[in-house]
Structures are given as structure tokens and as C-alpha cells.
Amino acid sequence: MGQKVNPIGLRLGINRNWESRWFPAKERTADFIAEDYKIRKFLKKELFYAGVSNIIIERTAKKLRINIITARPGIIIGKKGADIEKLKTTLVKMLGKDVAINIKEEKRPQASGQLAAENVATQLERRVAFRRAMKKVIQGALKSGAKGIKISVSGRLGGAEMARTEWYLEGRVPLHTLRAKIDYGFAEAQTTYGIIGIKVWIFKGEVLAKGIQPEPAEEKKGGRRPSRKRGE
């Protein structure tokens, strides 16, 4: 049974950068990791409806800078910047240090792996059929310029007695090609039948040196793996 490594971690230093950017003293490393987790958990919960695709944390000797990439920057900023100031005050009180917040707009939200996974999760929680939810997100990603997308859902799909995994694939998603720019996202849907896990891989093209042409490859359409029961 094949296991998938996280495609973002696999490409760190090749075509992806770290989401926590700091160099602490050895004894402070664990504290900073725990603090970063606390910040991300708080912001994802507080700004869920703003469509936050990524949170990048940078630290200097005296300052903490949080870069929030979002599909709806206006919701976070608020009228005349009132909401972002309120958010900053809450973070300063929670962390006990000076915090700077930068808001960046997600140019193509439908081609973001994290937002696509959260979109499917939201639809499943609203009792939309899982196949319909997956196909809708796939169509949106391809219209936004993605070259390929794969979505996997696992759990008691449709209220079935046995948990299973199903996935759809459109276009190309070359997970073994390190120069491929793969965006990955994971989300969980809290349904009445239990938790359903959603994973999304989106292929946005290849990062190549100047003068090098990508090799032509055939596109797959409508790929779908038959359902598989857990434990087989």
C-alpha cells in the first residue's frame, strides 16, 4: 500500500520556502514551535470565513511579523482597519510581545490547495453529496489555470457503514517530479457520521531554469479509483 509524503515538505529548498522563518538559540526552539502552532490555530479559527490559505511567521530579535495570505482581505482589515487593529491587540495580549500583521491577497483562491480542501469540507458539512462537491472544486481549479488536481476523501462517505477512500484526478499531478509546483491542502469535515478527511493536490506547472523546455506529457481525464475499505 503506497504512502504519500507531504509534497510541500519534499520540495522545501527547491521551489517552496519554509512557513516559519526564524533562527533561535537552541533552548528557545521548542518554545517558538509551540508559539507558532498556537498562533496558526488561533488565526485559522478566528479568520475561518476570510479564506486564509497560508500563514507565514517571521521573527527578528525584537519583533514578530505575521503574513496572512487570504482570499478576502477586506474581511480581515475591516472598516478603516478597525478589525485588523482589534486582531493585533488580541495577539499582543496573548503573546506578550510586539506583533506586526501583513495582509496579502490570494490571487487565485480556487487554485489554492488549502482553500479547495476547506471548500469540500464545508460542502460535506452542509450534506452535499461528496462526488458533487469534489467535481465542483475540480472544475473551479481547472478554470483558474491549474494544470491538474487530485482530491481524496476518506471516512464514512454518504453515511456508509464502512469507512472507505475515494479520489478523483483531472489533468496531471506529478508528485515525484521535484521541479513540479504542487500545492497541497488538508481539511476535516465534522459530519453526523464522523470525521471525513479531505486531501487536495494541485499542479500549477514546473519551475525550470531559463532555456529549458518541459517534457510533453499526456493528460489524464476523469480518473477515479474504486472505493477501498479500511483494513484491506
Swiss-Prot record:
GO terms for biological process: translation. InterPro entries: KH_dom (IPR004087), KH_dom-like_a/b (IPR015946), KH_dom_type_2 (IPR004044), KH_sf_prok-type (IPR009019), Ribosomal_S3_C_sf (IPR036419), Ribosomal_uS3_bac-typ (IPR005704), Ribosomal_uS3_C (IPR001351), Ribosomal_uS3_CS (IPR018280). Residues 39-107 form the KH type-2 domain. GO terms for molecular function: mRNA binding; rRNA binding; structural constituent of ribosome. Keywords: Ribonucleoprotein, Ribosomal protein, RNA-binding, rRNA-binding. One of its GO terms (cellular component) is cytosolic small ribosomal subunit. Part of the 30S ribosomal subunit. Forms a tight complex with proteins S10 and S14. Belongs to the universal ribosomal protein uS3 family. PANTHER family: 30S/40S RIBOSOMAL PROTEIN S3, SMALL RIBOSOMAL SUBUNIT PROTEIN US3C. This is Small ribosomal subunit protein uS3. The lineage of its organism: Bacteria, Pseudomonadati, Campylobacterota, Epsilonproteobacteria, Campylobacterales.
